[in-house]
Amino acid sequence: MSAEPVCSALPAIPYHKLADLRYLSRGASGTVSSARHADWRVQVAVKHLHIHSPLLDSERNDVLREAEILHKARFSYILPILGICNEPEFLGIVTEYMPNGSLNELLHRKIEYPDVPWPLRFRILHEIALGVNYLHNMNPPLLHHDLKTQNILLDNEFHVKIADFGLSKWRMMSLSQSRSSKSAPEGGTIVYMPPENYEPGQKARASVKHDIYSYAIIIWEVLSRKQPFEDVTNPLQIMYSVSQGHRPDTNEESLPFDIPHRALMISLIESGWAQNPDERPSFLKCLIELEPVLRTFEEITFLEAVIQLKKTKLQNASRTVHLSDKKKRELSPNIPVNSGPREESCGSSQLHKTSGSPGTSRSLSAPQDKDFLSAKTQDFSALHQCSVNHSRNSDFCVDCQVAFCDHRTAPCSLAIVNPLSAEGNSGRFQPGIAQQWIQSKREDIVSQMTEACLNQSLDALLSRDLIMKEDYELISTKPTRTSKVRQLLDTTDIQGEEFARVIVQKLKDNKQMGLQPYPEILVLSQSPSLNFFHNKSHKK
């Protein structure tokens, strides 16, 4: 007998309204993506459950009830839930998008954030305590039980938004659905887990003190900007050490003497991670201790700290793009950089680039270095002596992406894409032509791609070493054709242009005419391309 469906007060958000879904991260609670709501015209975040087999109605309702509770927890320092996407093959919570990522990124990306001012660090600690204290004061109390720096998000002004609280059923379902233990960051969670929770029988008695232990670890991490137990790789070693009473060092090396209010903060840390749960303070007591500390900083210092971080972040993003551009010119000095996608034609013997100014053109040429030809992840494109190295890794600076054209054939359409076009100076690359086309046709592809076309796409990706075994299994083990196609398209968003081109080509090969017009691209197998190139060079 199926469970009664949950009558949710949460707004229902249809999947097709979540445009431009882009993978952000994956954790114990599911996969997080960014998206743009088609009607609201704002960026949102979507946390969706890892579903490998159909959920029972009772399981789905358990998850929806949790989401309903989270929706009621409205507070300044709690991540707002905007709605639920509840469809047969997709179950996700839609929240506000946090542009400054997580506290974990702020603390440990030291190149991006070389200095995190003390006023802001203490404000963050205070706001975490305010948020968890609010949850504990709900009726009944809402316990987080997975508090860690990855779940503390930061809005545009670096204010705290606590996420992933009250998702015990969600996490349980996600973990049971997951085929790989690696998808759950157990080591990371163990660091913040109190020792009494290593023994499941002890959980009920000590549950209200779980979050304060996690908070003590977070305080240490914020003050030191180090990973707790960073030298220990085995979670079992951490569990044994902590159960014996060991904790991260509070000596001068970890917590220097120049930390403001150092003695008070160490006292708060040590009481928070006490071995006996009954000796740990409540969050209310923590707030009483922290409020005088916050008053020692003038309001202007918080504003200055935020401006400093934003300025540093923008400068580093700009420098990254500049260095990438410089490196690209050094690697391929004769290949000009375009400002965006352009359509070109190639003639019988040489390739011309149409510049931004009408009536001007330049020949493209590139070295015949065989290292370029042997690169495993290249997106091979050329004419005669032109070859371009391409990597599927989005962090690598790609020179250029072009379609290959044989001078012995008729002129063909040639797309040149500049993957260095940054979105908002963020250093993220714009998707290529095939990726853009797939994103624009996403729902049409989901409804029209046949099982045969799907299988051919997976086989082609495997033969080109473009898909990892884990991703292949994740797609192939989905219960229905549409869920397999959705997972394939999600993977395409992550893997890049070469991956996308294979899918587009297979759709064309299978005569999926309802998806026309197709983009002008050409996918080549590696060996014919290489043979053609070598034959050309030998003939010369």
From Swiss-Prot:
Q: Which residues carry this modification: Phosphotyrosine?
A: Y472
Reported modifications of this chain: Polyubiquitinated via both 'Lys-63'- and 'Met-1'-linked polyubiquitin following recruitment by NOD1 or NOD2, creating docking sites for downstream effectors, triggering activation of the NF-kappa-B and MAP kinases signaling. 'Lys-63'-linked polyubiquitination by XIAP is essential for NOD2 signaling and promotes recruitment of the LUBAC complex. Also polyubiquitinated with 'Lys-63'-linked chains by PELI3, BIRC2/c-IAP1 and BIRC3/c-IAP2. Ubiquitinated on Lys-209 via 'Lys-63'-linked by ITCH. Autophosphorylated. Phosphorylated at Ser-176, either via autophosphorylation or by LRRK2, enhancing activity. Autophosphorylation at Tyr-472 is required for effective NOD2 signaling. Autophosphorylation is however not essential for NOD2 signaling.
- Cross-link Glycyl lysine isopeptide (Lys-Gly) (interchain with G-Cter in ubiquitin) position reads K209, K536
InterPro entries with a match to the protein in the record = CARD (IPR001315), CARD_RIP2 (IPR042149), DEATH-like_dom_sf (IPR011029), Kinase-like_dom_sf (IPR011009), Prot_kinase_dom (IPR000719), Rcpt-int_Ser/Thr_kinase-2 (IPR017322), Ser/Thr_kinase_AS (IPR008271), Ser/Thr_Kinases-Pseudokinases (IPR051681)
Where do the segments described as Activation segment (AS) lie?
A: 167-193
Q: Which residues form the signal peptide?
A: none
Q: Kindly list the positions annotated as binding ATP.
A: L24, S25, R26, G27, A28, S29, G30, T31, V32, K47
Bilayer topology reads: Peripheral membrane protein
EC class name: transferase
A Pfam short name? CARD
**What is the protein named?**
Receptor-interacting serine/threonine-protein kinase 2
> Which species is the source of this protein?
Bos taurus
Gene name, Swiss-Prot/TrEMBL: RIPK2
